[in-house]
Structures are given as C-alpha cells and as structure tokens.
Amino acid sequence: MDYQELVEEATRQISSGVFLVSGQQANPMTIGWAQWGCIWGKPVLTVMVRHSRYSHSLLEDGRFTVSVPAPGGMKEELKVCGTKSGRDVDKKTLLSLKTVPAKKNGIPGIAGCAIHFECKTLLKTEVSMEDLEPELYQRFYNGATQATPDGDPHTLYFGEILAAYRETK
C-alpha cells in the first residue's frame, strides 16, 4: 500500500464528498471536510460531525470507516447520504448500497468506492465557538442560518488509520 498516494487521491476527492460510515448497521453519511496527517506518531484521519447528525451518536463507539468514491463517481449516492438522515431512512437499502468487509475495525466500507480508510478514535473534541475565528463562526455556525440556536457545532474525531487500501474488484 502506498499510503501517501491514497491520501493524495482522497484529498482531491473530499470537496466532492466521501462517505463516513459508522455504527453496527454501517450508516453512511456524506462529508466534505477531513484532514489526514501524522499525530502522536500515528497516521490520523480527522473527521467533523455536527451534534445534530445521527452519525454523531454512532461515532461514540470509537470506530469509523471513510470510503472514497472514484473521481466523479457515486454522485447520486453522495447526494442522498448528505441529505437524508439514518434516523429516518435506511440509506443502504434505499440506494441498494453494498458493503465491503472491514479488515481491522469492524466497520465495513461502501462497495464501489476506490479507497477505504478504517479508523479507531484516539480523541474527540468539540469546536469551541468562543475560540473560533469570527469569520468562520459567521460563515458556518451563525445561529440564524443553522437549525439549532447554538449553531450546531462540530465534534472532531481524530481516528488512527488502522487500514488504508484500494478496493479490489
């Protein structure tokens, strides 16, 4: 596995959306923000999830998988997984999504994706509204534009990458 190559490809794709998969039922959610790096001498993938999202509670078990579609791929699936909640609908059934078995963390990936990152949470921390740069607060957390009065802050989940691989057909 050329880890750096996988990270570079995933980084190019993140703005178009990738799947964050969590929970025993492998609930997929579309995310557009993530960060890859080395922290505490470990390869780490950091994802951000708002408190209001169904996936937020699922991430409490300390494991997640990020599945990265090929460039331009799975657009409809990403759209649905970014607009529908797993509280209300089984997105895997709705979209006829299949999964690929996990290799290390027990959380499968979404089949048909190019790359999968399996992670275990090392740390979770809340975005501090008081410490956030004011322009970012106004743009992403201003209570007037959010569904909740507190601006629906994110939790950052720092996940040690236990496995990173291309999907084989």
PLM features: residue spans?
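Active-site-proximal mixed secondary-structure blocks
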Residues: M1-I31, Q35-K169
